[in-house]
Amino acid sequence: MEDLYSIHPGISRVGGAASEASGVGVVVGGGGGSSSSDLTELMKAQIAGHPRYPTLLSAYIECRKVGAPPEVASLLKEIGRERRAGGGGGGAGQIGVDPELDEFMEAYCRVLVRYKEELSRPFDEAASFLSSIQTQLSNLCSGATSPPATTATHSDEMVGSSDEDQCSGETDMLDIGQEQSSRLADHELKEMLLKKYSGCLSRLRSEFLKKRKKGKLPKDARSALLEWWNTHYRWPYPTEEDKLRLAARTGLDPKQINNWFINQRKRHWKPSDGMRFALMEGVAGGSSGTTLYFDTGTIGP
């Protein structure tokens, strides 16, 4: 495999060529009485003459191009083009003559392809991230750029500005860019928190609305109760029959109606002194069968 590391004098060698050659020797075999160098040359010749050698060489070049500097990547691309134009070796042998060598070439090509994919993945992710950052910075800079001067006076002022003013302007633009970047980060944080806790917020809002609905009667029902209240203001104590009629009219249950009148009396009603005296007489004379009549209701024994 040393040919792979010697395809051009401008590409540095990578260690391990001898170990790869020995691995190939295990697969190819033969030449027990030959010297080590002769065996290596024989293996090189067998690999270079195999029909799969151009594919193997191309896969190797693609691996070396990953993460290489632009000049090295261009050089590797040119080498691959020259190899393809010149036949790139191979073709002399035939597949099936040496099944073990065929299997080795196929396996090694697959290994190089997978290796190239694994090498490319972090570089692709880094390139995508850098592209995204560049786009964001470009948007920030374009948004922070002030409009050009439109009058001759502005143009004269710009021509007469000093280097100190230019530095100050650049600093201001940098501050604006940093502020917008901070706002963008805050917005992203808010979006993340909203996505994470939106369910809890919705449940809390629903519970809060339920509590508010429980404590506030519908407008039509409240109007009907106020109408009864104003009509019977001197004695705002509805009887059970009154509560049933109000319940049918408002759609509320008697308990809600009773609670509303209790609260309404506590806040907005106070019996007169004469009514208090009448109530006391009514209570005292209840045993004698006396009944006190008021505007809309009665208090009896």
From Swiss-Prot:
Keyword Magnesium: no
Main location: nucleus
Comp. bias regions, Low complexity: 144-153
GO molecular function, one term: DNA-binding transcription factor activity, RNA polymerase II-specific
Cellular location(s): Nucleus
Xref: PANTHER family: HOMEOBOX PROTEIN TRANSCRIPTION FACTORS
Function, in words: Probable transcription factor that may be involved in shoot formation during early embryogenesis.
Family: Belongs to the TALE/KNOX homeobox family.
Designated name of the protein: Homeobox protein knotted-1-like 1
Organism: Oryza sativa subsp. japonica (Rice)
